[in-house]
Amino acid sequence: MAVMDSFLITVDGSEHEVSTGTVRRLLDTSARFWLDLAGVDKSTADGLLRDTFGFHPLAVHDAEHFGQRPKIDAYDDVTLMVVYGATGRGRLVEVHCLYTENYLVTIHRDACPELTALATRLKQRAEPRPDHVMLLYLVVNTLIDGYFPVLADLDDQIDELEDAILQRPTDQQLGQLFDMKRWLIALRKVVDPQRDMFATLTSGADALPGMTPDAERYYRALYDHLIRISDLVDSYRDLLSGVLDTHLSTVSNRLNVVVKQLTIIATIFLPLSFLTGFFGQNFSWMVNHITSLPAFLGAGIGLQVAITVALLVVFRRRGWLSADGTVPPARPADRPHVTRHERWHIAQPLKEPARP
């Protein structure tokens, strides 16, 4: 019974066929090995875990059912650890680790190239060989280290999204932003419980079998990594909230600019419409006095052009014609003069008062 996409290696770096016979032979010789089961069906996993290894029924049940919170449970002589990692493709992978003092069994539904790469390094590794505690550490450390490149890539995406929003906000950017927020929420749901789990593990309240003081230092480093990852997740969530506010503010500002421009157009045409209506009245005085071309050009066209130019000058001075609504900078002669001595004092940092 061979299992595809899985591997079995012993602590000496040799790889073996994943089969029931091989596992039984290694168990009979008390050899230390690591068995990784990737994407196996429930019947195959049940046969290996229950019949071949003889694990506790509750341990088998928890190991076969995914979607659990990160946790550590002890069942007789086996300890179950549920750990989440992040792959290079930006998705979470749930790994169930069945740990004993002689062997380690890892189970996961989705492919995890990081664990395969770790197995390759172990096969090529020279002495010293990791013991059972450090083997579990290497597996968990590989999964946790996968978060950092994913978060670094997310940081770059947030920067690019923020720059794009400042240039031209679109509805598509909102979809990208909310996808990132959902991804961070999913990260938080698994990172924080893992952080608490390793805090308990390194405090001595729920130590692993065979844990030594030297190995505990390595597991404490995992706890430090999870604290850092949790802080990064919180920082990126706050940053995305700021990007969302930036998007909404930018859209609102652009809308205000459009409304302002339309208001300017309506304001310009308001006096023109008044003049047109006023001189369009059919009274005898206007009909008798505005009869020549110069009178028409002066009263009908010239007055409207003068009003339009006057309004544009007023709008220009108030800064209403600029896209950002800012007032044009003052001329150099109109700016207040600051001497070099005054500039030097302005540039100096404030000194703290002397303490009593």
Spans of model-derived segments:
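Long amphipathic alpha-helical coiled-coil segments
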Residues: 201-216, 237-251
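Hydrophobic alpha-helical transmembrane segments and their immediately adjacent juxtamembrane loops
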Residues: 224-356
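Short acidic-hydrophobic sequence patches enriched in Asp/Glu that either
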Residues: 114, 214, 218, 294
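Peripheral, non-transmembrane regulatory/ligand-interaction domains of membrane transport proteins
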Residues: 1-204, 210, 221, 225-235, ...
